[in-house]
């Protein structure tokens, strides 16, 4: 108990100095952080990797996703902590056990904020999968200890001058490309929102005939995501939908909202979308509020399209997963 209180006080002082809204989030969560524990997740997939799968995604919670593309296994922004940054307790435990994962090829980190980069989660993964590659944007290395992972640092593409596309690497036949994200690097509040340190990115993951977009944290941009959608033929887009106070605005500060996520989905021209970055943590209102708004927007859009005779519906292409749920999008075709 004492250690939790000390952590909270230290982080509160730090966030107060930063002048950012995180101090209010911390204050509103302090009671839960000190006096409560997250609920246990209802179900976990015990055998997440299957040889017959071409593309699957398992939503672990918040922004953490386990991807299988053919024989390759990737973790995106893995954060399995119950308490994040000392001031935020998860609603429920991360919907995944490392012991249930038989292999891991790559870990992709979008930026160093504490709800996306967990030092302890990476240490746990390192114990079992030290040969995995750790991929991150330039600037994030400042916050990484000396893991045994092979580090792969990518230049970001967060500007019009860079055509919204950053560096890329081919790793074990998987091409990873950094793409535009309108957010911040840094880790502790002051370095992010005052000094505006670089070090954030989205990703395009290409392997064989499958392409996946992962947005990390980002606000909306009416040119960048159109450009990405023109350049890549995206099968699946993992798009954040929160946090947001007014989720029918396009963006707030440095996060896309539920409405903005639909605009991103349209711009990217992706076949399917999974919404992420909601549900696990409380950001000054109901953590599921972005999802409620998204569902309402989907229903309104589909009703309008039906009246106009348009068959292409969001409800058929946007897959809303429970934490711990895995969706298989395609299976490998077995030829007789």
Predicted regions and their residues:
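Bacterial N-terminal signal peptides
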Residues: 8-17
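Beta-strand-turn-beta hairpins that frame and shape the catalytic cleft
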Residues: 50-55, 68-74, 167-177, 206-212
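Active-site HxH/HxHxD metal-binding segment of metal-dependent hydrolases
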Residues: 95-167, 182-185
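Active-site metal-binding loops of divalent metal-dependent hydrolases
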Residues: 63, 78-81, 111-112, 139-140, ...
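Pre-active-site segment of Zn-dependent metallo-hydrolases
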Residues: 39-49, 60, 69-112, 119-127, ...
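Cap/insert and terminal regions of metallo-dependent hydrolase folds
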Residues: 106, 133-135, 139, 219-322
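Active-site-proximal loop/helix segment associated with metal-binding centers of metalloenzymes
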Residues: 175-207, 232, 236-238
